[in-house]
Regions:
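Active-site regions of enzymes building and remodeling cell-envelope glycoconjugates
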Residues: 75-83, 148-151, 256-261
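Glycine/threonine-rich flexible loop motifs
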Residues: 48-52, 186, 208-215, 387-390, ...
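ATP-dependent carboxylate-amine ligase
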Residues: 1-15, 36-39, 313-323, 327-337, ...
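N-terminal leader/targeting and accessory segments in enzymes
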Residues: 1-91, 95, 268, 294-296, ...
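Short secondary-structure boundary segments
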Residues: 67-70, 179, 201, 243, ...
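Phosphate-binding loop of NTP-binding sites
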Residues: 89-241, 247-255, 309, 371-372
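Acidic, Mg2+-coordinating active-site environments of NTP-dependent enzymes
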Residues: 72-75, 196-350, 373, 427-428, ...
Length: 494
């Protein structure tokens, strides 16, 4: 809890009407979450204006409101007016929660692909060293060994600060956080001082939001600018950067923090080579600081070699020896929905993966090709109300690698799923190889069933797009749908 008059001191040029000598027990920008003693922040969003809910918040128990527009309020309420409530929120919310990020080592992982697996690898290594670790990411929030659901890769400012505060209260020493480009562009991570920033890669995604690739890159770079910004309260900063990525050098230019670069082409300070893979595992040599280490993992795919290097780099910055890192990695298991093998005793492989970008899809298809014994069968679709330009690109990639391609639905949202499939189909036709073929089955359940029913011994059935997700977003509702459950059900029918 904080005194409102102290909260007001964190704001720029506030106009205060009413009594500010009140105690604030909670702070929120969601009128539905208001309780007695709350400060309600009215945000003017893209679709909803919080100023329309000020009086609803007061009825629910708010004792003060933070606004940027003139509002008629009911009751004896303190009204704080600022130029921009979103900017004000970034200042006052971390203060309200006592700047929790300053009490933990904060490791931020950003990039188009690989954030989730890299974050979980870092957690696994840190935990093996006896640290209590928190994770905030696409799959869930973890505080120690307890998992909580999450709705955005990076929560909004209020939720994030509340989560970080809870982590501190429960004794977390290290927080590993996936930091999305949306969060960086919208200031959701304001008030969070990162100790380590990790860059995995950058390929086309989220252009529906960022509009241009340069804007997308600029958003990602904010994390690296932050770790070397002046007036920092913490020491021991560093950046881990994939130098094989074509944008790695651009990211390096944005930070003056100590850097570990990683590569599989021998270009980094941390390098992997002599990579051997099976459908379930990988083995390779990691070279660092003049020494070689053999790393054996229960994960496969070249993309996971990159993820492992990123995690190793982050943990080296935390002072963990390469020997201890190597020991911990031997017991790491794949993250749910990341090249996850579905096994029901069938004579072919079924893999479920979250790949939903052109690069992500190509990565898992390259892995499938490296370990294939027979055909590659691909089941995938593209999301509605998202970057439509990647649809034909992903269609072309699927056709270039797949022997059989099933184009289907994947969270069509408000768009017509048939039209989305047609957009994908343009690229499929361009990329189709001699001897390969494709089929359109808009119903995702039917597409999965058909792919598995027609699989032959030695085939790899790759179901891409959803991974760990257990829902399908339709025009007027969200239904339960889990690719892993659907695959298992289909396997039991053959």
């Amino acid at each position: 809890m904080k005194q409102l008059q102290d909260i007001v001191k964190t704001l720029q040029a506030p106009q205060v009407t009413g009594n500010a000598a009140v105690e604030i027990l909670d702070i929120t920008a969601d009128s539905r979450a208001v309780k007695a003693g709350s400060l309600f922040i009215a945000l003017d969003g893209a679709t909803v204006d919080g100023h329309n809910y000020v009086n609803k918040a007061i009825e629910a128990g708010a004792v003060a409101v933070l606004v940027s527009k003139i509002v008629e309020v009911s009751g004896d309420i303190c009204v704080i007016t600022v130029e921009d409530t979103r900017t004000a929120m970034m200042a006052c919310v971390p203060y309200f929660f006592d700047y929790p990020a300053n009490s933990m080592r904060m490791i931020g992982v950003t990039g188009t692909n690989g954030k989730t697996t890299t974050s979980h690898m870092i957690r696994h290594i840190l935990k093996a060293q006896g640290h209590k670790v928190g994770v905030i990411g696409t799959v869930h929030i973890m505080i120690g060994d307890t998992s909580y659901p999450i709705h955005n890769t990076t929560p909004d400012v209020v939720d994030l600060q509340h989560i970080l505060h809870q982590m501190v209260e429960e004794g977390v020493t290290h927080c590993v956080m996936e930091v999305s480009s949306h969060a960086l562009a919208l200031g959701r991570v304001s008030g969070v001082e990162y100790d380590t920033a990790v860059f995995t890669n950058l390929t086309q995604d989220h252009l529906d939001f960022h509009k241009t690739f340069e804007n997308y890159l600029a958003a990602k770079c904010k994390l690296f600018e932050q770790v070397s910004a002046p007036n920092q309260t913490k020491s021991g900063k560093g950046a881990i950067i994939n130098i094989d990525d074509e944008y790695g050098h651009r990211v390096i230019e944005k930070t003056t923090a100590p850097i570990i670069t990683y590569s599989i082409d021998g270009k980094g300070t941390l390098n992997a080579h002599d990579v051997e893979m099976t459908p379930k595992s990988s083995r390779y040599t990691v070279s660092y600081d003049g020494h070689d280490y053999t790393v054996a993992m229960n994960t496969t795919g070249l993309f996971n070699v990159y993820n492992t290097l990123a995690a190793i780099g982050a943990c080296l910055l935390e002072g963990i020896s390469m020997e201890d890192i190597d020991k911990a990695l031997k017991t790491f298991s794949a993250v749910p929905g990341r090249f996850e093998l579905i096994e029901e005793g069938q004579p072919f492989a079924v893999v479920v993966d979250y790949a939903h970008t052109p690069d992500g899809l190509e990565n898992i298809l390259q892995t499938a090709k490296a370990i294939q014994e027979n055909r590659i069968i691909v089941v995938f679709g593209c999301g509605g109300d998202r970057d439509a330009t990647k649809r034909p690109i992903m269609g072309r990639i699927a056709a270039q690698y797949g022997d059989v391609v099933y184009v289907t639905s994947d969270n069509p949202r408000t768009e017509d799923p048939v039209q989305i499939v047609k957009d994908v189909e343009v690229g499929v036709k361009e990329g189709l190889r001699e001897g390969s073929h494709y089929e359109v089955i808009v119903d995702r359940r039917e597409a999965i069933q058909h792919a598995i029913k027609n699989a032959k011994p030695g085939d790899i059935v790759l179901i891409a797009g959803k991974g760990h997700e257990d829902y399908q977003i339709l025009k007027d509702k969200t239904i339960h749908f889990d690719d892993r459950e659907e695959a298992r059900a289909a396997l039991k029918e053959i």
